[in-house]
């Protein structure tokens, strides 16, 4: 009872803090206030430790790693987003993820704590097939890979938005120059060039970090799929069964393998590879969320305890 109450308290504290962090981040987009930025970062750190405490508490009183159903996996995914958020902060890197990870964490946790998954808030006894040492290895690797791949994909989507906006601005500016070619203002040209250079630098950094994060996520996804295959062989006598979850995991792996391949070709870097990563964003959600709710197979559990 004490552990359940503690888990309930930590859930609401983390959700409340992160709800305050998001509008704070939005304000920092308009006003560069150092104190405000620092407060929002500390808020995310507090959220990370609250979710960590929540998961540890659930682990203690349930007797198994909290990765057995949709609610627990969503909370772990929210924890993963928070982890990705705070790593650049401690390494003193410019945090390109802050505007992505904070909303991702609150949306994930918000759905997990909503009334739709009320039945899953109480921990259930694991079915025999899940009582394996591979549970933590396989599921944690898959969820960490989803978090990394989603963040990398969102960076690529941001890159595409900036790139296409720049092309529209250039097209509009070109038309303006053709109309007023005899009254061209040199100051406007300098400002226009500076903005383009700044956008170019930003897109380069976004491309670099999306590649790094997706590369990490792809590695974790590969480990997760391989460990799942070994576990499947122990539980069901077959490494691969082509059920919906396995099929979509393979599709996800293939899409991001194509992305990494395009990044090796300089002519396809930037917007071209970002388009592939953007497609991967949708594929991940189908693999993780859609199959769980709508699919049939060995991994399909929807709003109930995982049945294998």
From Swiss-Prot:
Subcellular location: Plastid, Chloroplast thylakoid membrane
GO annotation, biological process: cytochrome complex assembly
GO molecular function, one term: heme binding
UniProt membrane topology term: Multi-pass membrane protein
KW Chloroplast (keyword) present: yes
TM ranges: 17-37, 43-63, 70-90, 142-162, 213-233, 246-260, 274-294
Matching InterPro entries: Cyt_c_assembly, Cyt_c_biogenesis_CcsA, Cyt_c_biogenesis_CcsA/CcmC
Predominant subcellular localization, coarse grouping: plastid
Keywords from the UniProt entry: Chloroplast, Cytochrome c-type biogenesis, Membrane, Plastid, Thylakoid, Transmembrane, Transmembrane helix
Pfam families, per database record: Cytochrom_C_asm
GO cellular component, as recorded: chloroplast thylakoid membrane; plasma membrane
NCBIfam families: cytochr_II_ccsB
Summary of subunit composition and partner proteins: May interact with Ccs1.
Similarity-based family: Belongs to the CcmF/CycK/Ccl1/NrfE/CcsA family.
Primary role: Required during biogenesis of c-type cytochromes (cytochrome c6 and cytochrome f) at the step of heme attachment.
Name of the molecule in the record: Cytochrome c biogenesis protein CcsA
Originating species: Nymphaea alba (White water-lily)
Organism lineage string: Eukaryota, Viridiplantae, Streptophyta, Embryophyta, Tracheophyta
């Amino acid at each position: 009872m004490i552990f359940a109450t503690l888990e309930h308290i930590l859930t609401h504290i983390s959700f409340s803090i992160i709800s305050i962090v998001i509008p704070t981040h939005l304000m920092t987009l308009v006003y560069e206030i150092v104190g405000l930025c620092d407060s929002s970062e500390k808020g995310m750190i507090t959220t990370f430790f609250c979710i960590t405490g929540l998961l540890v508490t659930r682990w203690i009183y349930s007797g198994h790693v909290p990765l057995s159903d949709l609610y627990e996996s969503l909370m772990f995914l929210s924890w993963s987003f928070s982890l990705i958020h705070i790593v650049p902060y401690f390494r003193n890197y410019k945090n390109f993820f802050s505007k992505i990870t904070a909303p991702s964490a609150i949306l994930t946790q918000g759905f997990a704590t909503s009334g739709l998954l009320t039945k899953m808030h109480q921990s259930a006894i694991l079915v025999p097939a899940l009582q394996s040492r591979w549970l933590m290895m396989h599921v944690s690797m898959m969820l960490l890979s989803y978090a990394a791949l989603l963040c990398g994909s969102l960076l690529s989507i941001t890159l595409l938005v900036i790139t296409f906006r720049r092309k529209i601005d250039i097209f509009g500016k070109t038309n303006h120059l053709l109309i007023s070619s005899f009254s061209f203002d040199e100051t406007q040209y300098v400002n226009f060039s500076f903005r383009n250079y700044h956008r170019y630098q930003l897109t380069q950094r976004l491309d670099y970090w999306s590649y790094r994060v997706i590369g990490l996520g792809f590695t974790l996804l590969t480990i997760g799929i391989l460990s799942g295959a070994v576990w499947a062989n122990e539980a069901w006598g077959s490494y691969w069964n082509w059920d919906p979850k396995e099929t979509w995991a393979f599709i996800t792996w293939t899409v991001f393998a194509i992305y990494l391949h395009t990044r090796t070709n300089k002519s396809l870097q930037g917007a071209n590879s970002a388009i592939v990563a953007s497609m991967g964003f949708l594929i991940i959600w189908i693999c993780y969320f859609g199959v769980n709710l709508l699919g049939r197979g060995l991994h399909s559990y929807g709003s109930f305890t995982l049945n294998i």
